[in-house]
């Protein structure tokens, strides 16, 4: 494989694995199934293609099934295989499954796997399971609940491809929120084999009165996990019996239980590399940009905080379960309102302040310090916030072109045309966009400065966005800014981000302390001691209060 290379159809572009990619690709080829959680932009598509071509050439498989999201299939895999003249077939109708030939890469979206499950299973039977599965963005299979759309897709994927002889899962981030999300992926990989036994001697549950963990004996010790939801519950009670929450994560960070047993399962198949390890380039610089609310923002935030306080008390007035659920939904909505105020107070009718908020002013001040011949991106999560930031940017920078991309304005190919055409025609352009609108699809190496103006619930979602600008071919330094108000509920969200990232690092074989990771992600711990807590008043009713966060050892 050292001499392997691909030349595009015009003969002008050649690609070849570097030493690290070659080493890891060889490791995964030595196993029938493997997980390749390389960082975004590190060349997973190239490595997967190489492995598919190798197994086809050596008679190990008749077909290579590439399963991924629709945007990944249409804007990454299909153009890549076409560019390098590799035989492939995109499945858009069930009749297309009759038109595949031995040696083909068969590209199919997750939705069509669910819709054409019976027909795919027939192809698998006819090929005597002699197929190779490449599951790109495997984190899309992170649930098993029958009522969940993700759960339905996951079950269909397991039914079609669980018994294949060769499987390769790939994802820049294997989980979004907690380690329990890795179970469906491991189940697909190992297919209930002896390599995935329930090795935890003790299981754990949470005492509802004390909030502490209670251990009990595992009745399936050294046995296979039960199918589907029952197996998921055993996995959950083995390693993380409770979810991370906006409040709980600050008061008690959830460490992974039975960590040694989980690390053993992971070590069988995962080959983890960061972008720097694969490329040899240290281009990524993450920083925190702390902003200060203007008086109008502070007034609006206090209104939301007091309203939230009132809703918390109402939550326990009735013992009726439906009422409790309704109140809980109101609380969640109130948290989102507080976070929305932090991001862009101008979208609220009760806001009576200037058009350029304190957060916007902090971003614009930083942009003024950046050389004017550099392109800049500002990422948010809501269409109306895109429009508000774009309007403010046009006012603050009248001599610079401002482009916008929302989740509804453009189809994926239209977004690519906007980026590679109009946006890159200007050296000083500013792009304001929905973070999700660029994930898994577009590479924009021309952008060196990215502002995360609206924090997500996990860093893996945000990294899917900012790694659009940090690519394998990149040579310039890249700067990522996390914008936040330290004295707000965003401090809780930052703790949540770091805790989830710590779990992801564990799955990648890295044991890092909370404090070290806090600094590595660019946040300043002394500026985030104050956070919103849920407590109880003298009458035992829940209330919110501000406190100084103490970091546990």
Where are these regions (language model features)?
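Conserved helix/coil segment N-terminal to the catalytic DExD/H
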Residues: 97-104, 111-129
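Conserved helicase ATPase motor motifs in RecA-like P-loop NTPase domains
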Residues: 40-41, 164-179
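Conserved helix-turn-beta segment of the N-terminal RecA-like "Helicase ATP-binding" lobe
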Residues: 71-94, 189-192, 396
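Conserved RecA-like P-loop NTPase helicase motor core
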Residues: 403-492, 500
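Inter-lobe coupling linker of SF2 helicases/translocases
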Residues: 107-112, 126-127, 150-165, 195-347
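A conserved SF2-helicase RecA2
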Residues: 460-466, 470-552
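Conserved Walker A/P-loop ATP-binding site and its immediately adjacent core
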Residues: 45-47, 60-83, 179, 381-384
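Conserved Helicase C-terminal RecA-like lobe
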Residues: 3, 9-10, 15, 29-30, ...
């Amino acid at each position: 494989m050292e001499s392997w290379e691909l030349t595009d159809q015009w003969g002008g572009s050649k690609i070849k694995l570097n030493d690290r990619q070659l080493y890891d690709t060889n490791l995964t080829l030595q196993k029938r199934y493997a997980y390749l959680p390389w960082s975004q932009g590190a060349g997973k598509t190239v490595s997967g293609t190489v492995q598919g071509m190798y197994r086809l050439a050596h008679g190990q498989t008749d077909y290579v099934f590439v399963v991924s999201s629709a945007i990944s299939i249409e804007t990454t895999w299909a153009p890549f295989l076409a560019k390098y003249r590799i035989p492939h077939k995109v499945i858009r109708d069930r009749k297309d499954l009759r038109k595949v030939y031995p040696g083909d890469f068969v590209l199919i979206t997750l939705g069509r796997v669910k819709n054409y499950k019976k027909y795919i299973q027939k192809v698998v039977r006819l090929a005597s399971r002699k197929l190779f599965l490449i599951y790109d963005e495997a984190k899309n299979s992170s649930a098993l609940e029958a009522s969940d759309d993700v759960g339905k897709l996951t079950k269909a994927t397991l039914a079609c491809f669980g018994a294949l002889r060769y499987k390769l899962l790939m994802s820049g981030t294997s989980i979004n929120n907690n380690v329990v999300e890795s179970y469906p992926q491991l189940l697909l990989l190992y297919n209930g084999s002896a390599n995935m036994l329930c090795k935890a001697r003790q299981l754990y549950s949470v005492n509802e009165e004390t909030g502490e963990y209670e251990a009990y004996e595992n009745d399936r010790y050294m046995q296979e996990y039960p199918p589907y939801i029952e197996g998921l519950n055993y996995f959950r009670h083995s390693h993380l019996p409770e979810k991370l929450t906006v409040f709980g994560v600050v008061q008690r960070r959830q460490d992974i239980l039975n960590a040694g047993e989980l690390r053993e399962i992971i070590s069988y198949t995962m080959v983890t590399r960061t972008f720097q390890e694969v490329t040899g380039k240290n281009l990524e610089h993450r920083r925190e940009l702390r902003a200060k609310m203007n008086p109008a923002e502070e007034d609006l935030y206090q209104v939301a905080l007091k309203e939230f306080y009132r809703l918390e008390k109402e939550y326990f007035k009735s013992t009726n379960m439906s009422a409790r659920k309704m109140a809980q939904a109101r609380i969640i909505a109130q948290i989102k309102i507080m976070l929305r105020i932090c991001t862009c107070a101008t979208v609220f009718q009760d806001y009576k302040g200037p058009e350029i908020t304190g957060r916007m002013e902090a971003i614009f001040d930083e942009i003024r310090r950046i050389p004017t011949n550099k392109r800049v991106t500002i990422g948010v999560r809501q269409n109306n916030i895109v429009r508000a930031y774009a309007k403010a940017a046009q006012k603050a920078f009248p001599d610079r072109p401002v482009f916008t991309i929302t989740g509804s304005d453009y189809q994926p190919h239209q977004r690519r045309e906007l980026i590679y055409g109009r946006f890159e025609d200007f050296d000083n352009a500013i792009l304001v966009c929905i973070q999700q609108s660029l994930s898994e699809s577009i590479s924009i190496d021309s952008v060196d400065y990215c502002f995360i103006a609206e924090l997500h619930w996990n860093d893996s979602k945000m990294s899917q966005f900012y790694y659009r600008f940090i690519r394998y071919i990149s040579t310039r330094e890249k700067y990522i800014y996390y914008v936040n108000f330290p004295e707000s509920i965003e401090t809780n969200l930052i703790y949540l981000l770091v805790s989830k990232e710590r779990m992801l690092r564990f799955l990648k074989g890295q044991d890092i302390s909370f404090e070290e990771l806090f600094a590595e992600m660019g946040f300043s711990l002394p500026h985030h001691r104050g956070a919103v807590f849920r407590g109880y008043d003298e009458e035992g009713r829940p209330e919110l209060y501000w406190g100084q966060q103490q970091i546990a050892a």
